[in-house]
Amino acid sequence: MEALNTPLLKENPVTIQVLGICSALAVTSKLEPAIVMGLSVTIIVAMANVIISLIRNTIPMRIRIIIQLVVVAALVTLVSEVLKAFAYDVSVQLSVYVGLIITNCILMGRLEAFAMQNKPWPSFLDGIGNGLGYAMILVIVAIVREIFGSGTLLNIPVIPQCVYDAGYINNGLMLMAPMAFFLIAIIIWVQRAKDKSLQEN
């Protein structure tokens, strides 16, 4: 279970390993696309880890990256088509970003660092753990950005009208991509403040 638990906090792929930052900028202005993106990456990382782990002993080292990319590309295409079929509106919001999962550093990093050296079940848990760790950060950032940027959560108003009547206005800055950087930086700061072993000299 360590492979599942470690990536959630101690070795979070976004805040500790600093991977997958680009999509954190792109899809976190609203909670719904952030959830879908997080779940999509989780499924793809887990399945890709299992597939690569199953065939790891038959992959020539010289072309292993190409094979890993082919596996990931096939899974991303499958997930993209499923989203278009069952969640078209979200698929449109995510647009090219689902396709860019292929180049997500988290996927290639786990395939290369873990799946190529481990059996399918630990690889599956590692994929789920890293995917959920990634999704967790996306969801946290998206919740803050949507509430303060739009006054909604999952497109449902959460700030009472009386607050607006008192003079409050939504913070448009929260909907700009750089705010995701600032929020992730705050999460990293909190993590490192709580865990001294993460601090660099």
PLM regions: where:
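Short amphipathic alpha-helical coupling elements at transmembrane boundaries
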Residues: 6, 10, 53-57, 122-130
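The first (N-terminal) embedded transmembrane alpha-helix
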Residues: 8-26, 38-42
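Hydrophobic core segments of alpha-helical transmembrane domains in multi-pass membrane transport
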Residues: 21-25, 41-46, 73-80, 102-106, ...
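C-terminal ends of transmembrane helices
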Residues: 48-61, 108-118, 190-192
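Cytoplasmic-side transmembrane-helix entry/capping segments in multi-pass membrane proteins
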Residues: 59-72, 93-99, 126
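Transmembrane alpha-helix boundary signature
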Residues: 78-93
